[in-house]
Amino acid sequence: MDAVLLEHFPGGLDTFPSPYFDEEDFFTDQSSRDPLEDSDELLGDEQAEVEFLSHQLHEYCYRDGACLLLQPAPSAAPHALAPPPLGDPGEPEDNVSYCCDAGAPLAAFPYSPGSPPSCLAYPCAAVLSPGARLGGLNGAAAAAAARRRRRVRSEAELQQLRQAANVRERRRMQSINDAFEGLRSHIPTLPYEKRLSKVDTLRLAIGYINFLSELVQADLPLRGSGAGGCGGPGGSRHLGEDSPGNQAQKVIICHRGTRSPSPSDPDYGLPPLAGHSLSWTDEKQLKEQNIIRTAKVWTPEDPRKLNSKSFDNIENEPPFEFVS
């Protein structure tokens, strides 16, 4: 080796000036050095690109308040961004510094070289165990994970849920129909062939309740010593028993007379109406020994005649009348 060098360089290696030949620099393995460890060797554009990529990686890996993938690459201040060194193997992980909670505010990029960051952009994923990283997730992240893990219902389960919903709906409608049937049985109705609808039932119930309210407010005596009648031309009278002990409710059937032959009459073509009375008074007159009985009769309205009458007016105009 020396013979070959002397053959080509008769003056020896000492003839080269020192700036061109440094034994330490010549025999140093440059390939083993990390260019990121020495920030002075990086150019300005390369340094800016490294910082930009580091910030982008941090934003990508930060999920649900914790960075579980990567940590930001060191920039101009590698000691400020680097995670703290691990302690002894037996030292607990709770004593590690620079670790922040998931909800703590993140420090801006880049960090100042002279002071440590207020909170690292990653919650020390390199020094925390998987259990500690999982415990750092906040309540919202846990709820989101639970929603993602919600299992999909099978077709059989969906069919069972639909059947249960249908059964509940049928029971609800059946209870409503039973309630309307009970309401129809407590109010006097017309000799109407078709069963009253729910709307007509409510209208008649409102009128009947108003009639009963008028009786209570007027404080009319309820006496069962006799029964009242419904007079008028062509009218008929159904009397009850005149026994003093009879306190049962009495129904007075009132007929309007023969059907009017005139088509312009409002009652043309309508069947007779039934009136219901819960109170009556006796006015005994000694003249010719005649007894006149009067009663306050509530006459239900025919739903077929309510087309021209608004629903609001029926509460203010209860369908009852005085007959004698």
Swiss-Prot record:
Keywords associated with the record: Cytoplasm, Developmental protein, Differentiation, DNA-binding, Neurogenesis, Nucleus, Transcription, Transcription regulation
Lineage, highest ranks first: Eukaryota, Metazoa, Chordata, Craniata, Vertebrata
Tissues expressing this chain: Expressed in precursors of pancreatic islets, acini and ducts.
Stored Pfam families: HLH
GO MF term (any one): chromatin binding
Localization, UniProt: Nucleus; Cytoplasm
Main location group: nucleus
Biological role stated in the UniProt entry: Transcription factor implicated in the cell fate determination in various organs. Binds to the E-box consensus sequence 5'-CANNTG-3'. Plays a role in early and late pancreas development and differentiation. Important for determining whether cells allocated to the pancreatic buds continue towards pancreatic organogenesis or revert back to duodenal fates. May be involved in the maintenance of exocrine pancreas-specific gene expression including ELA1 and amylase. Required for the formation of pancreatic acinar and ductal cells. Plays an important role in cerebellar development.
PANTHER family per record: BASIC HELIX-LOOP-HELIX TRANSCRIPTION FACTOR, TWIST, PANCREAS TRANSCRIPTION FACTOR 1 SUBUNIT ALPHA
Gene that produces this protein: Ptf1a
Gene inactivation effect: Early postnatal lethal phenotype characterized by a lack of the exocrine pancreas, however, islet-like endocrine cell clusters are formed. A redirection of pancreatic precursors to intestinal fates is seen. At 16.5 dpc embryos show reduced size of cerebellar primordium and cerebellar aplasia.
GO cellular component assignments: cytoplasm; cytosol; nucleoplasm; nucleus; transcription regulator complex
Keyword Manganese: no
Region (Disordered): 302-324
Domain bHLH: 160-212
Protein name (Swiss-Prot/TrEMBL): Pancreas transcription factor 1 subunit alpha
Subunit record text: Component of the pancreas transcription factor 1 complex (PTF1) which is composed of TCF3/p75, TCF12/p64 and PTF1A/p48. TCF3 is responsible for the nuclear import of the p48/p64 complex. Interacts with TCF3 and RBPSUH/RBP-Jkappa.
UniProt-listed GO biological process terms: amacrine cell differentiation; cell fate commitment; central nervous system neuron differentiation; cerebellum development; exocrine pancreas development; generation of neurons; hindbrain development; neuron fate commitment
